[in-house]
Swiss-Prot record:
Source organism: Xanthomonas euvesicatoria pv. vesicatoria (strain 85-10) (Xanthomonas campestris pv. vesicatoria)
Coiled-coil residue spans: none
Record-given protein name: Phospho-N-acetylmuramoyl-pentapeptide-transferase
GO molecular function: metal ion binding; phospho-N-acetylmuramoyl-pentapeptide-transferase activity; UDP-N-acetylmuramoyl-L-alanyl-D-glutamyl-meso-2,6-diaminopimelyl-D-alanyl-D-alanine:undecaprenyl-phosphate transferase activity
InterPro entries documented for this protein: Glycosyl_transferase_4, PNAcMuramoyl-5peptid_Trfase, PNAcMuramoyl-5peptid_Trfase_CS
Length: 361
């Protein structure tokens, strides 16, 4: 929105040419989302607190979590609102990738909102039935994959790349591309949701991964950097740095209220949508495998649930004291802040490894 105004004003004053730089608008997007979150946060939390009862607490969970009863949930609505406003202000609204990612965020956020609504109104900790949740996620995930496939304007946009082996490029047919896109979008949507079980645990890795994906998006959309780093050149992908920056700013603003002990929980409205956005951006910039590395905390949390379920069904025994794995460490006696910060540290390391793949050939 403001980019179009700046382009017109540039004819009168060259200073407005700054808005043509992605990095400049990315910084403004992050700051806008951050300050909007800090400004709107208290009012949003008060409004959410009017839903009496707050987030239901699992009866089989750690005993320390019962003190969280009544804490407002659906705080992810603050993230979605500030990200959307920031992107509409600073993004190039002629870019199809911007609209796709916003659409994915809103659609998955709607699923999460309904899930949270059931938990709060009906006092059902399980929320929306899994089959309906996965059905809706599948519809939106497949729709995003189909859109990306049929709007691809360069072969690189539908080619599978393996980090550190940049000479290996696997062209994807329609079905295989859409299936991969589906699994990454829906998979990371649920992975972030599983991780969101402790105060601030999910949002900080999300911020870190979003920042790193912003670097990949910027490089992928730049002819010089893409050629130098030997990564796929995806015209228009650079604009995604605006969305990544907005997520980083909104996430830090939300963390201000979500840090231990949390004043508000993100809820499924935030976790499902943010995970889907990370997966979508990774698919667009053709860095699916790098996302698996950088989002390793989300992957580990998901694998712990899968291992727990399979082990119990096959042997009747549980591998972990409780899944996802962050609850396992809680039940081992780790204080909640220790679990959170250590998972953050792991996330920092994994993101740095992911960024290092830019130079490894």
């Amino acid at each position: 929105m403001l980019l179009e105004l700046a382009r017109w004003l540039q004819q009168l004053e060259s200073l407005f040419g700054l808005f043509n730089y992605l990095t400049f608008r990315g910084i403004l997007a992050a700051l806008t989302a951050l300050f909007l979150s800090l400004w709107m946060g208290p009012a949003v939390i008060r409004k959410l607190a009017q839903f009496k009862g707050g987030q239901p607490i699992r009866q089989d969970g750690p005993q320390t979590h019962f003190s969280k009863a009544g804490t407002p949930t659906m705080g992810g609505s603050l993230i979605l609102l500030t990200v959307t406003l920031s992107v509409l202000l600073w993004g190039d609204l002629r870019n199809r990738y911007v609209w796709l990612v916003l659409a994915v965020m809103i659609c998955f956020g709607a699923i999460g909102w309904y899930d949270d609504w059931i938990k709060i109104v009906k006092r059902d900790p399980n929320g929306l039935k899994s089959r309906w949740k996965y059905l809706l996620q599948s519809i939106f995930g497949l729709a995003a994959g189909l859109f990306l496939y049929y709007t691809a304007d360069v072969p690189a946009a539908i080619t599978f790349y393996i980090p550190m082996f940049k000479s290996i490029a696997l062209p994807l047919a329609g079905v295989s591309f859409v299936v991969i896109a589906y699994f990454w979008i829906v998979g990371f949507s649920n992975a972030v949701n599983l991780t969101d079980g402790l105060d601030g645990l999910a949002i900080m890795p999300t911020v870190l991964v979003a920042c790193a994906l912003g670097v990949f998006a910027y490089a992928s959309g730049n002819v010089v950097f893409a050629e130098y780093l030997k990564i796929p050149l995806i015209p228009g992908a650079g604009e995604l740095i605006i969305i990544c920056s907005a997520i980083a700013g909104a996430g830090l603003g939300f963390l201000w209220f979500n840090t231990y002990p949390a004043m508000v929980f993100m809820g499924d409205i935030g976790a499902l949508s943010l995970g889907a956005v990370l997966g979508t951006i990774a698919v667009i910039v053709r860095q699916e495998m790098v996302l698996v590395i950088m989002g390793g905390v989300f992957v580990i949390e998901t694998l712990s649930v899968m291992i727990q379920v399979v082990s119990f069904k096959l042997t009747g025994k549980r591998v972990f004291r409780m899944a996802p794995i962050h609850h396992h460490f809680e039940l081992k006696g780790w204080p909640e802040p220790r679990v959170i910060v250590r998972f953050w540290i792991i996330s920092v390391v994994l993101v740095l490894i992911g960024l290092a793949t830019l130079k490894v050939r």
